[in-house]
């Protein structure tokens, strides 16, 4: 975790920002909960447990800054709630998501399944793709299993 924090600190410094204690507390919460897709309120509640002096507005500002610097991605799964996801180190693209419409579970697909599609778009449309996001909405294997029982 400390290596990731050091890299994020360097990323902030390269854009003339500092990793303040408040920002570090927010980053640590994101790292500790990397498998989850936390809302700003979720992040705030977890930060508050360790650093009660940090306010909600500070957490919001920190998340917006981290989004702007591409340390995190701000995502919305169609439920009106923005969630924050740490960018995977070295990933050329944002990972994909499977969102269960029954239980709300969110699973991640790390593989870039759209390489062929990207090549066609770049070749035929002369469109230079910088990133993409793909979210599938359906019924997860856990809920699917319940239907057959």
Curated annotation (Swiss-Prot):
Biological process annotations from GO: negative regulation of DNA-templated transcription; regulation of secondary metabolite biosynthetic process
Native source species: Bacillus subtilis (strain 168)
Subcellular location(s) of the protein: Cytoplasm
Keywords assigned by UniProt, alphabetized: Cytoplasm, DNA-binding, Iron, Metal-binding, Repressor, Transcription, Transcription regulation, Zinc
Subunit-structure text: Homodimer.
Role, per record: Iron uptake repressor. Acts on the transcription of ferri-siderophore uptake genes.
Record-stated family: Belongs to the Fur family.
Keyword Transmembrane helix: no
Protein name (Swiss-Prot/TrEMBL): Ferric uptake regulation protein
Keyword Disulfide bond assigned: no
Sequence positions that bind Fe cation: 93, 95, 115, 132
Region (DNA-binding): 6-91
């Amino acid at each position: 975790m400390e290596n990731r924090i050091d890299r994020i600190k360097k990323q902030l410094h390269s854009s003339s920002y500092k990793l303040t204690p408040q920002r570090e507390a927010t980053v640590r919460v994101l790292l500790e909960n990397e498998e989850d897709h936390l809302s700003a309120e979720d992040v705030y509640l977890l930060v508050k447990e360790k650093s009660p002096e940090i306010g909600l507005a500070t957490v919001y500002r920190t998340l917006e800054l981290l989004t702007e610097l591409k340390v995190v991605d701000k995502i919305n799964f169609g439920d009106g709630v923005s969630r924050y996801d740490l960018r995977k180190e070295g990933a050329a693209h944002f990972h994909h998501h499977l969102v269960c419409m029954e239980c709300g579970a969110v699973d991640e697909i790390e593989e870039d399944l759209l390489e062929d599609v990207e090549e066609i778009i770049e070749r035929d449309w002369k469109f230079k793709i910088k990133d993409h996001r793909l979210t599938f909405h359906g019924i997860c294997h856990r809920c699917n299993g319940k239907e057959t029982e």
